[in-house]
Amino acid sequence: MKWTCPLGPRFLQRENPENLLQKSEIKFLNQVQGPESVAFDPLGRGPYAGVADGRVLFWNGRSWTDFAYTSPHRSDICSPKPSPLSYLKNEHICGRPLGLRFEKKTGDLCIANAYFGLLKVGPEGGLATPLTTEAEGVPLRFTNDLDIDEEGNVYFTDSSTTYQRR
């Protein structure tokens, strides 16, 4: 398959002043492990990021702080580790937040968790509570991402009806 940039070859050149990616920088390197999704709350604060150990973190302008937990079974096995791969064997216990979206009207954060389905936590954070673990009687096996429309309807993806992430 061949692809041609519709903006022309000049757009892809390294020295193109219109290429905004040249001005980008990597933020928070080695500060958070395995961020999958980021979101900003209705007041524009954040980012909030779901990470590999099951937490949702909040950037307060100076550092990352805990905002929410996705597992009621959180213990020392869920403590931060140096590599995202270190979390795989305990994800089913610690949780794995893959999608984050704020409800604009309430400020609640909805979380798509690979193991615990759809969760929600209030604007103050804390332990997220389940919204649902099934759809039309079929258990959610790999809840991956979500979005919320203006009326508050939640749309989500469940990437497998058979397999979980691990």
Predicted features along the sequence, with ranges:
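Asp-box/WD-like beta-propeller blade repeats and closely related beta-sheet repeat scaffolds
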Residues: C78, P84-L98, E103-K104, D108, ...
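Soluble, non-transmembrane catalytic domains of enzymes that act on hydrophobic metabolites at membranes
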Residues: A39-F40, G44, W59, R101-F102, ...
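Short active-site oxyanion
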Residues: K23-I26, G44-P47, G107-D108
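Conserved beta-strand positions that form and line the central face of beta-propeller blades
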Residues: I26-F28, D66, T129-L131
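WD40 beta-propeller repeat fold
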Residues: I26-E36, F40-P42
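Beta-propeller domains
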Residues: P6-R10, P17, L43-P80, G117, ...
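Short coil/turn segments at the loop-to-beta-strand junctions that recur within blades
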Residues: V32-P35, S71-S75, E134-P139
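Blade/loop signatures of beta-propeller domains
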Residues: M1-E25
